[in-house]
Amino acid sequence: MKDAPLQIHVLLGLAITALVQAGDKKVDCPQLCTCEIRPWFTPRSIYMEASTVDCNDLGLLNFPARLPADTQILLLQTNNIARIEHSTDFPVNLTGLDLSQNNLSSVTNINVQKMSQLLSVYLEENKLTELPEKCLYGLSNLQELYVNHNLLSAISPGAFVGLHNLLRLHLNSNRLQMINSKWFEALPNLEILMLGDNPILRIKDMNFQPLLKLRSLVIAGINLTEVPDDALVGLENLESISFYDNRLNKVPQVALQKAVNLKFLDLNKNPINRIRRGDFSNMLHLKELGINNMPELVSIDSLAVDNLPDLRKIEATNNPRLSYIHPNAFFRLPKLESLMLNSNALSALYHGTIESLPNLKEISIHSNPIRCDCVIRWINMNKTNIRFMEPDSLFCVDPPEFQGQNVRQVHFRDMMEICLPLIAPESFPSILDVEADSYVSLHCRATAEPQPEIYWITPSGKRLLPNTLREKFYVHSEGTLDIRGITPKEGGLYTCIATNLVGADLKSIMIKVGGFVPQDNNGSLNIKIRDIRANSVLVSWKANSKILKSSVKWTAFVKTEDSQAAQSARIPSDVKVYNLTHLKPSTEYKICIDIPTIYQKSRKQCVNVTTKSLEHDGKENGKSHTVFVACVGGLLGIIGVMCLFGCVSQEGNCENEHSYTVNHCHKPTLAFSELYPPLINLWESSKEKPASLEVKATAIGVPTSMS
């Protein structure tokens, strides 16, 4: 009991001491500020309990004159501080300083000599205009520096000298117009660099070479139009790069190959018009690829994404013109699990595209204008265990009988196994105005089964076939037409035609050069009778005009009959020879060709012709039969002789001039309506009642070279 008063005195003493210390700390805390222990993460993401002084958003004009001695984090965000004058009183253990959203106009107004323990400094959203030499020299332990959203237009070559431990540097959203590699010579340990939203316009080779440990680079929104081949040289540890919101019109393939350890690539929101063969290939560590929000992207071509053994995810969404993905676009991607293709202009996705991805687990193709026909029927054939994301948003747009139905609810047997080609309306515009001597690329893509072949027709009626160079024109195998150094002479209406065994589709574009529109020069239109039989007439035509549309209308009338009703056929304007069949013997016909122009007018010319009698035609047929037998016999003889020598003969083409021609020896007449029946139905807009005369188009030969 004697010790009780002593214990009471001791406890009272301790309590008084604690109260005194608490009172001292409360006095040290700046007025209106909050001083407390808060959780905090270091730049290395290490969690700690830090003594924090929170003076945010108090309208302070000056830096606090006094701070608790144990302060570790000082928050002065959203005040009106223009300079720091009491740096000598800084707590020695201060590790984090937030001066963002103040009125600092110069780093020289921040005396950092007593802040050697600082790890993080936030200076964003101030009024800094430059970073002079050695402006932060005293911060030898600094790991994070945020100078983004200022007015920086100049950074001295040695501005970052002394910051050899810096890990993160944020310079985005300033007024920098160039990148100087000397900035980075003092930053050997930098891992994250943000340079986006500066009016830099271009970067140079070796710009980032000193940054040997850089892991993440963001150069978004700087209006880049190209990336030099050696721009990323030296970045052997780079794992992530973002080119978001620039003006790249093609993938910087060569430059990306220099970043050998790249894992995450962001090319979103660039006007890249197509992903070409080999654009993303042999990038052995790439895991995620983003090609979203590209306003000009039309297609992903064959082998565009190839041999990426570690790729897990592709995002190609919200591309309003992306209408075509080649069946072999994604190749040798053994670990790809997620394929995001929603909200594009895709009418179909080939089954071959999915079959080439053995580890695919989920796919998103909703919010696309799906055409429910042969190309997409695989979805409902239970041939895949892939999960379709948001299946309730996957609807048919075409054909009319399925419009509005959910794709997964249309039975695959209701879709044809083969179907007409379809050129996406988004492939290219209907009118294009370009400057003289410029380079023009027109991207035409079509889906169908069997896969269609694509060729182009020039304003002068010449046919341009794939992989063929002709004057200023070159057509790529995928369907892209390149025109080099275009002049007003090459202006006019260009037509892309996609054909397969079922039929054809076409789409035209009017190209103006320097605002010049080709005028109707009333060029000549001539019809020539090439051959007359009892039941058919072979006619050809030639027109000197650059404004003709892509379809030609042939019409035949029986002159001896009162009725003027007649059936007609529409064909591509590059078909210069046409065979009218199923005619009556010894009958006079009026055959007319009607060619519309781009000015809603038409060129029309007619010719009168009388078919031969059956007797007269029979004699000629006999002669033709003899000639045919002789030709066949001679051909068999030649083949026999060649076989004796172990050679293989292949019959050459029988094409004459630039059009369909007659070859009675080698090629029998094939009805155009049998070869391309849907094509005739598609283009025939007449709703007339069937006439007594049946006129059908007949293809005499399929051209194999350019016109």
Curated annotation (Swiss-Prot):
<keyword id="KW-0677">Repeat</keyword>
<dbReference type="GO" id="GO:0005615">
    <property type="term" value="C:extracellular space"/>
</dbReference>
<feature type="domain" description="Ig-like C2-type">
    <location>
        <begin position="421"/>
        <end position="514"/>
    </location>
</feature>
<feature type="transmembrane region" description="Helical">
    <location>
        <begin position="627"/>
        <end position="647"/>
    </location>
</feature>
<feature type="topological domain" description="Cytoplasmic">
    <location>
        <begin position="648"/>
        <end position="707"/>
    </location>
</feature>
<dbReference type="InterPro" id="IPR007110">
    <property type="entry name" value="Ig-like_dom"/>
</dbReference>
<keyword id="KW-0433">Leucine-rich repeat</keyword>
<dbReference type="InterPro" id="IPR003591">
    <property type="entry name" value="Leu-rich_rpt_typical-subtyp"/>
</dbReference>
<feature type="signal peptide">
    <location>
        <begin position="1"/>
        <end position="22"/>
    </location>
</feature>
<feature type="repeat" description="LRR 1">
    <location>
        <begin position="70"/>
        <end position="91"/>
    </location>
</feature>
<keyword id="KW-0393">Immunoglobulin domain</keyword>
<feature type="glycosylation site" description="N-linked (GlcNAc...) asparagine">
    <location>
        <position position="382"/>
    </location>
</feature>
<dbReference type="GO" id="GO:0051965">
    <property type="term" value="P:positive regulation of synapse assembly"/>
</dbReference>
<dbReference type="InterPro" id="IPR000483">
    <property type="entry name" value="Cys-rich_flank_reg_C"/>
</dbReference>
<feature type="topological domain" description="Extracellular">
    <location>
        <begin position="23"/>
        <end position="626"/>
    </location>
</feature>
<feature type="repeat" description="LRR 12">
    <location>
        <begin position="335"/>
        <end position="358"/>
    </location>
</feature>
<dbReference type="InterPro" id="IPR050333">
    <property type="entry name" value="SLRP"/>
</dbReference>
<feature type="repeat" description="LRR 4">
    <location>
        <begin position="141"/>
        <end position="162"/>
    </location>
</feature>
<dbReference type="InterPro" id="IPR003961">
    <property type="entry name" value="FN3_dom"/>
</dbReference>
<dbReference type="GO" id="GO:0031012">
    <property type="term" value="C:extracellular matrix"/>
</dbReference>
<feature type="repeat" description="LRR 8">
    <location>
        <begin position="237"/>
        <end position="258"/>
    </location>
</feature>
<feature type="glycosylation site" description="N-linked (GlcNAc...) asparagine">
    <location>
        <position position="579"/>
    </location>
</feature>
<dbReference type="Pfam" id="PF00041">
    <property type="entry name" value="fn3"/>
</dbReference>
<keyword id="KW-0472">Membrane</keyword>
<dbReference type="GO" id="GO:0044877">
    <property type="term" value="F:protein-containing complex binding"/>
</dbReference>
<keyword id="KW-0812">Transmembrane</keyword>
<dbReference type="InterPro" id="IPR001611">
    <property type="entry name" value="Leu-rich_rpt"/>
</dbReference>
<dbReference type="InterPro" id="IPR036179">
    <property type="entry name" value="Ig-like_dom_sf"/>
</dbReference>
<feature type="repeat" description="LRR 5">
    <location>
        <begin position="165"/>
        <end position="186"/>
    </location>
</feature>
<feature type="disulfide bond">
    <location>
        <begin position="444"/>
        <end position="496"/>
    </location>
</feature>
<feature type="repeat" description="LRR 10">
    <location>
        <begin position="285"/>
        <end position="304"/>
    </location>
</feature>
<feature type="repeat" description="LRR 6">
    <location>
        <begin position="189"/>
        <end position="210"/>
    </location>
</feature>
<feature type="repeat" description="LRR 2">
    <location>
        <begin position="93"/>
        <end position="114"/>
    </location>
</feature>
<keyword id="KW-0732">Signal</keyword>
<feature type="glycosylation site" description="N-linked (GlcNAc...) asparagine">
    <location>
        <position position="608"/>
    </location>
</feature>
<feature type="repeat" description="LRR 7">
    <location>
        <begin position="213"/>
        <end position="234"/>
    </location>
</feature>
<feature type="domain" description="LRRNT">
    <location>
        <begin position="23"/>
        <end position="69"/>
    </location>
</feature>
<protein>
    <recommendedName>
        <fullName>Leucine-rich repeat neuronal protein 3</fullName>
    </recommendedName>
</protein>
<feature type="repeat" description="LRR 3">
    <location>
        <begin position="117"/>
        <end position="138"/>
    </location>
</feature>
<feature type="glycosylation site" description="N-linked (GlcNAc...) asparagine">
    <location>
        <position position="522"/>
    </location>
</feature>
<feature type="glycosylation site" description="N-linked (GlcNAc...) asparagine">
    <location>
        <position position="93"/>
    </location>
</feature>
<dbReference type="InterPro" id="IPR003599">
    <property type="entry name" value="Ig_sub"/>
</dbReference>
